[in-house]
Swiss-Prot record:
Complexes and interactors: Part of the 50S ribosomal subunit. Forms a cluster with proteins L3 and L19. In the 70S ribosome, L14 and L19 interact and together make contacts with the 16S rRNA in bridges B5 and B8.
Source domain of life: Bacteria
UniProt keyword Plastid present: no
Origin organism lineage: Bacteria, Bacillati, Actinomycetota, Actinomycetes, Mycobacteriales
Record Pfam families: Ribosomal_L14
Species, as recorded: Mycolicibacterium vanbaalenii (strain DSM 7251 / JCM 13017 / BCRC 16820 / KCTC 9966 / NRRL B-24157 / PYR-1) (Mycobacterium vanbaalenii)
Gene: rplN
Name of the protein in its database record: Large ribosomal subunit protein uL14
């Protein structure tokens, strides 16, 4: 569960290393974001020479959460960390590589480009 002020690792090669959630998209009073939800975030830590700089405001999709999520078949999925992938306005990733596994929920929410770039879908 991601909410305002949550810090997430960035799981792509855009140059950002850490982002801070400033808004969960999808309703005026929506509080939490899970796997596959889009957030607005600011870049808190970035490497020099990357596509994004520290202080940039970006859109990102959550790909891993430490809070367990119940699936329709009764199983639960959780990860060791909270992570996101920075996206463009058309929901395509800004980077060309994705690091680490991503949740299967991304396929249901039509983030097919991220699913195809990911090394593993859990």
């Amino acid at each position: 569960m991601i909410q305002q002020e949550s810090r997430l690792k960035v799981a792509d090669n855009t140059g950002a290393k850490e982002i801070l959630c400033i808004r969960v998209l999808g309703g005026s009073s929506r509080r939490y974001a899970g796997i596959g939800d889009v957030i607005v975030a600011t870049v808190k830590d970035a490497i020099p020479g990357g596509n994004v700089k520290r202080g940039d405001v970006v859109k990102a999709v959550v790909v891993r959460t430490a809070k367990e999520r119940r699936r329709a078949d009764g199983s639960y999925i959780k990860f060791d960390e909270n992570a996101a992938v920075i996206i463009k306005n058309d929901n395509d990733p800004r980077g060309t590589r994705i690091f680490g596994p991503v949740g299967r929920e991304l396929r249901e929410k039509k983030f097919m480009k991220i699913v195809s770039l990911a090394p593993e879908v859990l």
